[in-house]
Every structure is written in C-alpha cells, then in structure tokens.
From Swiss-Prot:
TM helices/strands, residue ranges: 5-27
Pfam family name, one: PsbN
Subcellular location: Plastid, Chloroplast thylakoid membrane
Keyword annotations from UniProtKB, A to Z: Chloroplast, Membrane, Plastid, Thylakoid, Transmembrane, Transmembrane helix
Superkingdom, natural source: Eukaryota
Protein name: Protein PsbN
Main function: May play a role in photosystem I and II biogenesis.
Biological processes, Gene Ontology terms: photosynthesis
PANTHER family: PROTEIN PSBN (PTHR35326:SF3)
GO annotation, cellular component aspect: chloroplast thylakoid membrane
Entry annotated with the keyword Membrane: yes
Length: 43
C-alpha cells in the first residue's frame, strides 16, 4: 500500500471518529450535563 493511501485512510478515520464523538456528546447521554446559557439568564 502506498504511503499516500495510508495517510488518506488514517485522516478519514480520524475525521469520522471525531464527528461521531461530537454527535454522541451533543445528542447522547453526556448532553444531559450540558448547560444552555440562554436558559440561565432571564430578561
């Protein structure tokens, strides 16, 4: 396997895993701990 293919596959896997983690953090169980700054301040 060429070096360019290996680098491309590695970067693609990294981006997919980071995207999956971001979606899990936003909508999964950890999202219950996130705070909404607009709900904290009353006008």
């Amino acid at each position: 396997m060429e070096t360019a293919n290996l680098v491309t596959i590695s970067i693609s896997c990294l981006l997919v895993s980071l995207t999956g983690y971001a979606i899990y953090t936003s909508f999964g169980r950890p999202s219950e701990q996130l705070k909404d700054p607009f709900e904290d301040h009353e006008d």
